[in-house]
Amino acid sequence: MNTTFPAVYGPVNSWRYGRSLGIDPIGAISTCSFNCVYCQLGEIEHLSGDRQIFIPTADILRELAQFAPWEVDVITLSGSGEPTLAKNLGEILEGIKKLTGKLTLVLTNATLLNDAQVREELSLADKISVKLDGLWPDQLQRINRPIAGIELEQILTGIQTFQQEFTGELSVQTMVLQPWDQTTENRYLELLSLIKPTEVQLNRPTRPKPLQRELEGRGNHTGTPYGDRPVTQIKCVDGQTLQNLAKKISGAIGIPVRCAPVKVL
C-alpha cells in the first residue's frame, strides 16, 4: 500500500447529497469493473471484478478520525473506482458509523449486486446510489465499457434483488450524454418501474476526461482542475435539456427526479 495516499478527501459540495466527506477504499491505482467513457479519474488503470483489501480498515478510520468533528451531511464511499471491490467494505461502513455517527452513502456501478455478501455489506449504508447509464446491452458496452462477463441483465437483476432487501434509500444515477428519443425515454421508465428507486438523479459530465490517472478526479470539481495536462472534451446535453427530461420522467412515474444544476459548468 502507498502510505502517502489520502484515503479520505474533501469535504466536497454535492448537488445530490450536500456537504460530503469522501472515503476512497480503492487506493492509489484506480480499479473498477467499468471503464466509462466519461470517467473523471481518466482511463482506469486496473480493470477487475475481483474483491480484495486495498487499504486496511484501520488505516482509513485512523485518517477519518483526523477530520473530526465531521461537519458534513454525509460520508460517501466512492473514490478511485468501484467501492464494492473492497473486501473490507462492510468493516469500513461499520467503523464509519461507530466513529462518526454520520449518514453513509455508497456510489456503486451495481456489477457485484448478485453477490449476497456484497449486498449484505452494502445494507450497512444509509443510502446507496446505483449507476444506470446503458439502457440496452450495446449502450452498456459503449458507455461503461465493462470487463468481460458483465451483462446488463445481470446488473438489473442484482439491483432489483438488492432493492427488495435494502431498508435505506436507493437512488438511480444516470449520466445522460445526448438527448433521448421517445424509445429511450420509454425504456428508462420501464427499467425504473422494475427497480422502484426512492429517487432518480440525472447527471451530465461537468468537465473533460483526463487522458491519464488524475487524483483530482475524486473531488466534485467543475471546470478544468487538471491544469495543462491532456484531456478529452466530452459532448453532452445542455443543462436545460436535462431539466426538461427530469420533469417528463418525474411526471410519468411519480418518483422524485433531480438533475445537475444548469450552471454547473
UniProtKB/Swiss-Prot annotation:
Residues 204-230 are annotated as: Disordered. GO terms for molecular function: 4 iron, 4 sulfur cluster binding; catalytic activity; metal ion binding. Residues 16-252 form the Radical SAM core domain. [4Fe-4S] cluster binds at C32, C36, C39. Signal peptide: none annotated. It holds the Pfam family Radical_SAM. Its cofactor is [4Fe-4S] cluster. InterPro entries: Aldolase_TIM, GTPase_Obg, rSAM. Keywords: 4Fe-4S, Iron, Iron-sulfur, Metal-binding, S-adenosyl-L-methionine. Binds 1 [4Fe-4S] cluster. The cluster is coordinated with 3 cysteines and an exchangeable S-adenosyl-L-methionine. Belongs to the UPF0026 family. This is UPF0026 protein slr1464.
